């Protein structure tokens, strides 16, 4: 078939569609969002009734995908790296249950934290779950891995983890597609107890997983994504993982003088590793992320061979890998031709003009400064996190999805008053509801501001699970309806908003304020599409 110019994310999505996908499950998060959006917009999705709705969070996405696999269908789960923390309960246990229909989990990592709280490396999740992993070096490999990965998942009976990174997810390349496969029919496991993880059966299933490890290593040794290329200069051997191989080849367009082991599939291929180790004086590990392979090699080799990489300072311990850092690591002259002109100023993200979060912060901060000058506000993950910046300087925390409510409760437990949390509507239904339940169960003196812009705005305006139902959810959890207050955050309503904020902050119990106004960007898109 002819080539298409695709983002790395789009290559994954197209491969899944071509491989007979029956459902994609995801919660939006950069740099993974475009995978699901591409599937949602593809004509074949409607034609073949491929499930494609956003989930409340990554845990529900992982569980629903496992359910799709349970009935023999092929499923894709997509999330950013910190979403793996949310999905981990089901993800780790799915390695023990195994799968029926092919199941691929995409974890899009964000080295350098372009839009994330940390730069954790998802390969560690695959490693301690004992399942096979893919790590593509380019868009074509991303496509090929997913296309064949469903069949591989069904063959070995396990979910497959695929790790992407921001630069690969959000850059384009020509991708050659393969033939379209039909969706699987409904089938069930021959073992009726496969998915029942009672301790007695879980122990049996775990032994099955352990028995598959040699098969996984053999698959890695025979994989087209793990390739050993010899070189004349044996002073150095290079292990290049994922996009690190791409950066290495940018420095050696005519071929590398050193032996190179390209890694695209895990567990590590022992046969090729021995070949590299036995012929080279020292080893350099290139990986875009934490020293996952480097640590394994140090333990694998003992003290016999020197291993260089992030741990010894050859490469920086934080931030992205790039062609320049690879050039320095192999002792090549840095020939970068482009610098950043001094006239180009930093333009940090800011709340949009006309955004309802602005009006919420202005009124909330005015009230708190007047009544409680030493106040603290606990916030969360979303556009409103930008309230940390000038001119608002309105919040004191941003840790993880849903943490605003439970951190405010913990602070209230410790004697802080007022304890104020700010959270968005999508983040509230993702991970905030259980925190609110804790507050209700203990009648904590907490004021929770659910700033409702009726969408998941920061990642591009995806559907929010609680749209139009936030008040009902709060009441259902047990918040007194008299202390669930809805306001429209507009300048003309400032005095009304400030009065409501004063009343609810002074209330000794659980109170919820919902400033509701549609995201200004979503509204603009709707008007343009008319």
Question: Which sequence ranges carry the predicted segments?
Answer:
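Short beta-strand segments
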Residues: 78-79, 104-108, 161-167, 239-240, ...
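Short helix/loop capping segments that flank catalytic or ligand/cofactor-binding pockets
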Residues: 87, 114-116, 170-173, 246-250, ...
């Amino acid at each position: 078939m002819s080539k298409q110019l695709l983002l790395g994310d789009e290559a994954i999505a197209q491969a899944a569609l071509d491989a007979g996908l029956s459902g994609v499950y995801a919660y939006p998060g950069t740099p993974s969002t475009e995978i699901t959006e591409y599937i949602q917009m593809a004509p074949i999705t409607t034609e073949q009734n491929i499930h494609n709705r956003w989930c409340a969070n990554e845990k529900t996405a992982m569980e629903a995908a496992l359910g799709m696999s349970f009935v023999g269908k092929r499923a894709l789960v997509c999330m950013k790296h910190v979403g793996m923390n949310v999905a981990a309960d089901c993800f780790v246990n799915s390695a023990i249950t195994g799968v029926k229909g092919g199941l691929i989990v995409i974890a899009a990592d964000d080295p350098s934290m372009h839009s994330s709280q940390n730069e954790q490396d998802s390969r560690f999740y695959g490693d301690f779950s004992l399942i096979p992993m893919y790590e593509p070096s380019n868009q074509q490999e991303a496509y090929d891995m997913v296309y064949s990965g469903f069949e591989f998942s069904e063959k070995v009976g396990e979910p497959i983890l695929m790790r992407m990174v921001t630069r690969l997810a959000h850059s384009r390349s020509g991708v050659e597609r393969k033939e379209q496969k039909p969706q699987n029919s409904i089938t069930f496991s021959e073992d009726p107890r496969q998915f029942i993880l009672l301790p007695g059966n879980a122990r049996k299933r775990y032994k099955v997983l352990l028995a598959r490890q040699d098969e996984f290593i053999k698959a890695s040794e025979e994989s087209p994504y793990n390739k050993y290329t010899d070189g004349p200069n044996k002073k150095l051997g290079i292990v290049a993982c994922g996009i690190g191989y791409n950066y290495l080849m940018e420095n050696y367009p005519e071929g590398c003088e050193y032996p190179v082991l390209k890694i695209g599939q895990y567990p590590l291929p022992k046969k090729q590793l021995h070949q590299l180790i036995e012929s080279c004086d020292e080893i350099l590990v290139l990986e875009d992320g934490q020293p996952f392979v480097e640590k394994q090699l140090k333990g694998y080799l003992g003290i016999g061979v020197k291993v260089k990489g992030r741990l010894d300072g050859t490469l920086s311990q934080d931030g992205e890998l790039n062609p320049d850092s690879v050039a320095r690591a192999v002792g090549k002259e840095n020939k970068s031709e482009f610098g950043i002109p001094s006239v180009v100023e930093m333009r940090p993200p800011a709340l949009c003009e006309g955004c309802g979060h602005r009006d919420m912060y202005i009124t909330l901060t005015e009230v708190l400064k007047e009544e409680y000058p030493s106040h603290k506000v606990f916030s969360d993950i979303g556009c409103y996190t930008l309230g940390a910046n000038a001119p608002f300087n309105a919040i004191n925390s941003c840790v993880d999805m849903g943490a605003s409510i439970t951190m405010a409760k913990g602070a209230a437990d410790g004697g802080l008053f007022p304890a104020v949390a700010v959270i968005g509507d999508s983040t509230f239904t993702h991970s905030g509801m259980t925190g609110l339940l804790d507050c209700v169960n203990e009648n904590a003196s907490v004021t929770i501001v659910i700033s409702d812009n009726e969408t998941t705005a920061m990642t591009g305006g995806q559907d929010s699970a609680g749209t139009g139902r936030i008040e009902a959810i709060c009441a259902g959890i047990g918040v007194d309806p008299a202390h669930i207050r809805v306001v429209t955050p507009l300048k003309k309503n400032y005095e009304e908003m400030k009065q409501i904020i004063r009343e609810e902050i002074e209330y000794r119990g659980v109170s919820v304020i919902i400033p509701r106004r549609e995201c200004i960007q979503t509204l603009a898109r709707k008007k343009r599409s008319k």
